[in-house]
Curated annotation (Swiss-Prot):
Phosphothreonine modified-residue sites: 538
InterPro entries: ATPase_NBD, Heat_shock_70_CS, HSP70_C_sf, HSP70_peptide-bd_sf, Hsp_70_fam, HSPA4_NBD
Amino acid composition bias (Basic and acidic residues), ranges on this chain: 514-533, 788-799, 829-840
Principal location listed in the UniProt entry: cytoplasm
Location of region: Disordered: 500-575, 783-840
Positions where N6-acetyllysine occurs in the chain: 53, 430, 679
Disulfide partners: none
Protein name: Heat shock 70 kDa protein 4
């Protein structure tokens, strides 16, 4: 079973796998561990990753990048409106109201959802992992920013399904970094001791995230998170781009922003310049040849000037740092370490700001680029039954407070209640109790819209169906289980109605006989963090079982709280009935549409595969043309007649011209047939060359064999001791076979020497190999027959043993005899060691 962690970044992606030796970040087909988050659409296929990155400028309108933040967002979203101006491709409104991406693919205009585009990237990363692991990849853990809302998280989950992946967990990027940091630490405080507080700062290409985590041995608890969703490396790039657009506009009279290709080229150069300035404080040049209207442009920049231009951005570094300390009520002295990751943290001014705020040196023990994917792979290994991993519990937080709203007839309006506060532990479940006579609807929403980086605070509506009053007309008790799962997604996971069955005896009043106003109140059962933490550590296969356990425990606790003392005296029976729940999720893709996207992705993967095979077949023809044309005037020259060489060379030239004209775009089979046609002419020449190389070596080997056997035959005839045990008839057979082989070899050599090199050889290498094998199989068993061993006679030893007792020496041995007996009874040291030596 494969264990894979995927860091799905804004600009680039990483894939890590868990193996017996630990966690390994794997490389793609370009031997690069970083895969650009880029997809280019062409007339025949899609290019994904590094291949697409090279087409950003040449195929700008159909090359998609920077789409990560479109997940779960409507086309009218202010964020989408702001992003559109920076994109080379078209962003359109889909029939559902969501943001779509418009490109030309397979010679026709196509609109793709953000989920489809992300699924394409995930399919590529999946293929990369499978090529390294040599087995299918299904289970994975995918990273998302900690500030993602429900709609965005569900959108990413849909993308994983389209790509054919089973996402065991959507993991917050800062939590993944914390796991990668903590699981290997051997010096963490014990569970009963004060935890170690570590701040993790992650500034990537598009966003800035901060979290505070408390570590104990085998335990990680996220205390709080803070973020700036738009502060990242690209903002610093934009400062440089805007500066040079203005400078080149004045200096060269160019309107750079009117030409998207020119703007993309400038963006690439500015990103390189920014990275150079991180390591160099001196003036650095920026030069671009034939930049726009055949004009070469150049400029300079240094770190000091760049930092002055970025003052507004640098001022945004501190607020999230201050926010996490305020949320956790920690002092700077309570922080053990500040660990930084993400590409933008390499900017010296950013590091200086963070270090100055905490008043301590920053820690860089983690790989700034790969920490997230390594943490995801570790989480996948923890969830997978295929790996035995050190026990390590992970408790995350809810980034925004979540509330429920419902209609309350008794109060003639709506009521609401906050079920999960900000920084509440997650994953987590709660059981709520309602008293209702009819179906009702719960509306989930984020209760602090001002803190939300998303325009719509609504999460979903959950309608609890088939609610009926009790037999006496009173309100029924309805238990609703709400939870934030391991993906950070809120849901009403179940609802049940408690039916009361009364006996015929007079009973004391039940809890259900409350006044109408009290019936409308909601009761929240006590929380169970321990159950959730246990569920967190169980393998993915046991999730359902854990949830059942959690529900039953919550139910029993609820009964204890709700059941009044009078009920013990009354003879009352209760039963629960599961109620159906209808979900209306914000921007959720329906199952039918999701299946269609899965089918379309499969078709596109197959089209890419067919196009690759077609290109490989075409390249094979081109490669053969160049190879044979070169060798015909080189090493193959002696093995082909002048007329044949001229005609074959002409054929190769015609094929080359055909490849760039009529044969430029042909089906795969046409190229396969063309290659076979060329090989019919070229293969005989190649074989003649190979035979001329191998034949002398094999004849030499055969000659050595014959000489060896002739020497042995001569030694046998001279009756040398070494061979005097061999049978004469067998040696006659050896002599006959050797003479026949010599005659065959001489005959073939003479014929071959008379044969022209431009003609097929008289004898082929395989025939010589067969003759060597035949001669060896006949002669070798005979001449290698071992000499029979001659054992010394044992009669004298037996007589010596019998004579001793007969002479009477056995009863009264003298001193000498006694000594001899002792020697015989106790063997010497050398005698003792012999068996060991023999064994060795």
């Amino acid at each position: 079973m494969s264990v894979v962690g995927i860091d799905l970044g804004f600009q680039s992606c990483y894939v890590a796998v868990a193996r017996a030796g630990g966690i390994e970040t794997i490389a793609n087909e370009y031997s690069d561990r970083c895969t650009p988050a880029c997809i280019s659409f062409g007339p025949k296929n899609r290019s994904i990753g590094a291949a697409a990155k090279s087409q950003v400028i040449s195929n700008a309108k159909n090359t998609v990048q920077g789409f990560k933040r479109f997940h779960g967002r409507a086309f009218s979203d202010p964020f989408v409106e702001a992003e559109k101006s920076n994109l080379a491709y078209d962003v359109v409104q889909l029939p559902t109201g969501l943001t779509g991406i418009k490109v030309t693919y397979m010679e026709e205009e196509r609109n793709f959802t953000t989920e489809q585009v992300t699924a394409m990237l995930l399919s590529k990363l999946k293929e990369t992992a499978e090529s390294v692991l040599k087995k299918p990849v299904v289970d994975c853990v995918v990273s998302v920013p900690c500030f993602y809302t429900d709609a965005e998280r569900r959108s990413v989950m849909d993308a994983t399904q389209i790509a054919g992946l089973n996402c065991l967990r959507l993991m917050n990027e800062t939590t993944a970094v914390a796991l990668a940091y903590g699981i290997y630490k051997q010096d963490l405080p014990a569970l009963e001791e004060k935890p170690r507080n570590v701040v993790f700062v992650d500034m990537g290409h598009s966003a800035y995230q901060v979290s505070v985590c408390a570590f104990n041995r085998g335990k990680l608890k996220v205390l709080a998170t803070a973020f700036d969703t738009t502060l990242g490396g690209r903002k610093f790039d934009e400062v440089l781009v805007n500066h040079f657009c203005e400078e080149f506009g004045k200096k060269y009279k160019l309107d750079i922003k009117s030409k998207i290709r020119a703007l993309l080229r400038l963006s690439q150069e500015c990103e390189k310049l920014k990275k150079l300035m991180s390591a160099n404080a001196s003036d650095l040049p920026l030069s671009i040849e034939c930049f726009m209207n055949d004009v070469d442009v150049s400029g300079t920049m240094n770190r000091g000037k760049f930092l002055e231009m970025c003052n507004d951005l640098l001022a945004r570094v501190e607020p999230p740092l201050r926010s996490v300390l305020e949320q956790t009520k920690l002092k700077k002295e309570d922080i053990y370490a500040v660990e930084i990751v993400g590409g933008a943290t390499r900017i010296p001014a950013v590091k200086e700001k963070i270090s100055k705020f905490f008043g301590k040196e920053l820690s860089t023990t983690l790989n700034a680029d790969e920490a997230v994917t390594r943490g995801c792979a570790l989480q996948c290994a923890i969830l997978s039954p295929a790996f035995k991993v050190r026990e390590f519990s992970i408790t995350d937080v809810v980034p925004y407070p979540i509330s429920l709203r419902w209609n309350s007839p008794a109060e003639e309006g709506s009521s609401d209640c906050e079920v999960f506060s900000k920084n509440h532990a997650a994953p987590f479940s709660k059981v709520l109790t309602f008293y209702r006579k009819e179906p009702f609807t719960l509306e989930a929403y984020y209760s602090s819209p001002q803190d939300l980086p998303y325009p719509d605070p609504a999460i979903a509506q959950f309608s609890v169906q088939k609610v009926t009053p009790q037999s006496d007309g009173s309100s029924s008790k309805v238990k609703v289980k709400v939870r934030v799962n391991v993906h950070g997604i809120f849901s009403v996971s179940s609802a049940s109605l408690v039916e009361v069955h009364k006996s015929e005896e007079n009973e004391e009043p039940m809890e259900t006989d409350q006044n109408a106003k009290e019936e409308e109140k909601m009761q929240v059962d006590q929380e169970e963090p321990h159950v959730e933490e246990q569920q967190q550590q169980t393998p993915a296969e046991n999730k359902a079982e854990s949830e059942e356990m959690e529900t039953s425990q919550a139910g029993s606790k609820d009964k204890k709280m709700d059941q009044p003392p009078q009920a013990k005296k009354a003879k009352v029976k209760t039963s629960t009935v599961d109620l159906p729940i209808e979900n209306q999720l914000l921007w959720q893709i329906d199952r039918e549409m999701l299946n269609l996207y899965i089918e379309n992705e499969g078709k596109m993967i197959m089209q890419d595969k067919l196009e690759k095979e077609r290109n490989d077949a075409k390249n094979a023809v081109e490669e053969y043309v160049y190879e044979m044309r070169d060798k015909l005037s080189g090493e193959y020259e002696k093995f082909v007649s002048e007329d044949d060489r001229n005609s074959f060379t002409l054929k190769l030239e015609d094929t080359e011209n055909w490849l760039y004209e009529d044969g430029e775009d042909q089906p795969k089979q046409v190229y396969v047939d063309k290659l076979a046609e060329l090989k019919n002419l070229g293969q005989p020449i190649k074989i003649r060359f190979q035979e001329s190389e191998e034949r002398p070596k094999l004849f030499e080997e055969l000659g050595k064999q014959i000489q060896q056997y002739m020497k042995i035959i001569s030694s046998f005839k001279n009756k040398e001791d070494q061979y005097d045990h061999l049978d004469a008839a067998d040696m006659t057979k050896v002599e006959k076979s050797t003479n026949e082989a010599m005659e065959w070899m001489n005959n073939k050599l003479n014929l071959q020497n008379k044969q022209s090199l431009t003609m097929d050889p008289v004898v082929k290498s395989k025939e010589i190999e067969a003759k060597i094998k035949e001669l060896t199989s006949i002669c070798s068993p005979i001449i290698s027959k071992p000499k029979p061993k001659v054992e010394p006679p044992k009669e004298e030893q037996k007589n010596a043993e019998q004579n001793g007792p007969v002479d009477g020496q056995g009863d009264n041995p003298g001193p000498q005899a006694a000594e001899q007996g002792t020697d015989a009874a106790v063997p010497s040291d050398s005698d003792k060691k012999l068996p060991e030596m023999d064994i060795d």
